[in-house]
Amino acid sequence: MFFFKKNKNLKAFLTGELVSIDTVNDDVFSKKMMADGIAIKPNDDKIYSPCNGTVEVVFEGSEHAIGIVMDNGLQVMIHCGLNTVNLTGICSSKVKKGDKVKAGQLIMTFDREKLKEENCDDITMLVVLDQGKAKSITFVGDQNVVANETEIAQIA
């Protein structure tokens, strides 16, 4: 098994209220069927990269989710809103597959009003897809967070 030589921190990808992924009103996330992670109830409409890495995937059509492979090989996915997979014109990716991103770089915007009109929750999740590559991942507890400033997870 590969262990990282030094700790890596993930920064808040949105400004808002950080909550446990267990509280998300979607079993795929709350029951950690995809992976463990964290969620933010946003105060704004801009999503930033929580880490340095390479964009692995941008979901076509809806652009509601972006996967990033961190420079240390760990994969994270940011998923904007609930029940957004079939919606178009609400999320707008600012990156494409293969792009190198830096922590704090704007990677997506979304229309919060349109999400409300579609009766979709704008809570946004970050999941760590291949946690077995890390010795430990520690997510912080519920709190208000500021994008690019507040540490939300430490990976060892």
Predicted region positions:
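Contiguous, well-folded functional domains in the mature portion of proteins
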Residues: M1-A156
